[in-house]
């Protein structure tokens, strides 16, 4: 990795959130900087660059959908200024950062995904009966600026071409302004302003301080008049929480663009799974075969999308009984099962979330088959009831009927299946402690701030996309099950689209039945 340079000469406004980070980076790097500082160098590097030929793009496909989403948010908050940050880079160690990902609400309301600019902010400013939308981000510096070559965080010599304000305005079909102009927004902030708090803590603090300042000045002013849309803020920031709730609930029902992106993410994930199977000979030859699985799938995710949508679970043998095994440092042994839970995230940030469990040697043992078919029966039972009008939690309840029935039939429960299903018992949940379904979209666990009455207790609607993912997990040291069951973990997870009269399994093309999975594994070997 190239040595970072001293950013102390970069022209960073002292009023912007970037300034403190840039200054800290500069301070850390001064002890090893070799950045040329001579006037001859500065003159030489700032001249003789070709003119950029950058025709403005047509609006991207999702721009119209993003505008419609903004209109819905606007209608929910008449007269209030709304601040939705994209968020800043997150430090990994010293002067290295994690790959940037904008906040999902920002992406949803702008259509800006993996090519978005760190530190950008969407502001919906009250105007008439609605709002005017503006995206603020840092305009790129000219080649005659120190920023171009001396700022490793944003200089184009370091990170590559950055978009102009005009380019982004045309691309997203929304007004844009330089982030320095956001200072004027902060100066106008009053208590009729809401901010999406979790997206950018430093920016949120600026908004909080501005609201407090406005309230104090208003209280001290003898001639102050009430602001028509003034609202009280308590320590829990409830009005801001309302904004987080609305933008989260807006994503419960997907539009046509989102559904197409989710299907594309599923299709890419299917290809990634197939490539993992093709590499099984190499995977089984490595001490950390699970890491090879993770790497093979990640390659497909980077080729066809932005990244993996979450930490891939490549769990072989007894690791499959650990629900979120992301360490992925174990061997992959013929005769064992592999539980692969992974999803490709598109450049738009929409992600798949698929799990398949397969035998390393291409053949399920008798007990592996028994467990697998029980989980498949639970998944199919849950899918069979999905249609508009049911309550979301019924999907889980249907799967649990099968899990309780099977574990009771095998003699693992101290009561009958019916008794175990009673809320005060739930013995069968020892072998499946997680839920069966969650909403899917820009986040793998989408709509996280939605109210329970609209999520778990909500009515299923056409356009919703969620997972169905029952499983059975028998820990290696679980004395309630026979020895031959111990160390077996099986999960089958599909991504489900609710239609007008039923549902479609978006991942149905990825083999699910015992015979199909065995043929899939064997066929991938050539």
PLM segments and residue spans:
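Active-site neighborhoods and metal-handling regions in enzymes and metal-associated proteins
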Residues: 1-526
